[in-house]
């Protein structure tokens, strides 16, 4: 009889676990801890950095670098941030970031001052020969790509291997 009481108690405790939902924790590997959603005039911003979701940080981050050099994390869901960053990412990144041939770890640095991208980096974690984080071999400086307006450079640069062979 006592064994039946313990088994019922154990069953009740295990059933309570069904209703427990893990709380959203702050990802410590994300760059932004606190996000700013109030409007910042573009004439005060020097660069905008867009960092897409990675295995280390499960959210998109938008970082504005004002002309004084500090960094301000912007709320990517704020309407003015979407209106500012949307055309930039649509112009310089692939249409569908969820496709398998495009890597999930991407970072874009855009110069508001000069109205051009400065840096794009990404990696492909599913390919063991390529690092899943930005390094020199998987990064492209847009100075090299200024003459190329075709979007296919993203596919070409994402397939840079560490061994130097594409096999």
Curated annotation (Swiss-Prot):
Chemotactic for neutrophils. Involved in lung-specific neutrophil trafficking during normal and inflammatory conditions. GO terms for cellular component: extracellular region; extracellular space. It holds the Pfam family IL8. This is C-X-C motif chemokine 15. Belongs to the intercrine alpha (chemokine CxC) family. It comes from Mus musculus. Expression restricted to the lung, produced by bronchoepithelial cells and is released into the airways. Expressed at low levels in fetal lung. It comes from the Eukaryota.
